[in-house]
């Protein structure tokens, strides 16, 4: 096992200007998969500035912080988001093949 970081992105799906969800959750998941590639996506509810919205928690392994920041910039533009939260977790991980 090697020590690496896992990143979890929290992507709200409500447009920052209209406060309405423009893209369906299933379509949003497909877009995230196109941008990020290998990841685990979990549907959840989140709150931003007191506003409840559908949120995707996106878990990413075996990537660098720079790659993750690049994904966030792309996703911010696509989903018209003010920000995307990034959680960085140090852990031991390996792929068993």
What are these regions (language model features)?
Residues 1-97:
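Positively charged, small/polar-rich N-terminal and surface patches that mediate targeting and assembly
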